[in-house]
From Swiss-Prot:
Its cofactor is Mg(2+). The gene is rnhA. GO terms for biological process: DNA replication, removal of RNA primer. It is found in: Cytoplasm. It comes from Idiomarina loihiensis (strain ATCC BAA-735 / DSM 15497 / L2-TR). It is an enzyme of class 3 (hydrolase). It comes from the Bacteria. This is Ribonuclease H. Endonuclease that specifically degrades the RNA of RNA-DNA hybrids.
Amino acid sequence: MSNSKTVHLYTDGSCLGNPGPGGYGAVLEYGKHHKELSQGYRLTTNNRMEMLATIAGLRELKRSCHVILTTDSQYVKQGVEQWMHRWKQNGWRTSARKAVKNKDLWQQLDEEVNRHKVEWKWIKGHSGHKQNERCDELARDAATREPMLEDEGFGGE
């Protein structure tokens, strides 16, 4: 992957109520190219929206890339960097042998992350970071407008 292009991906999720209506926002930047993604869901959680922002952004990349992924979600960053490998080894169960919450999205995230070389960066949310603020706007807007999708994997937890 030494010849792969470097893409910057910024992500954020929003949920009004948690659970409640939610949305995600993602911004992809490569050279002079800039693309924004967003989608709203009728009933979901903030964590699911953070995950879907990351999945949607990575899916947008048609070939393997070096991705510098900036998120304000410790849940997503730590999940991928620290927990997911063990969950996968344990049949998507926690160390306490309980089913992993949001397993459907962790499995999709695992697939997408493995297609790329991802460098994770965490930033504090609402700290004035330009792209994170834009992702937040996209996510909040998506959570309040049609068309909204059903979050098929949300089980009401």
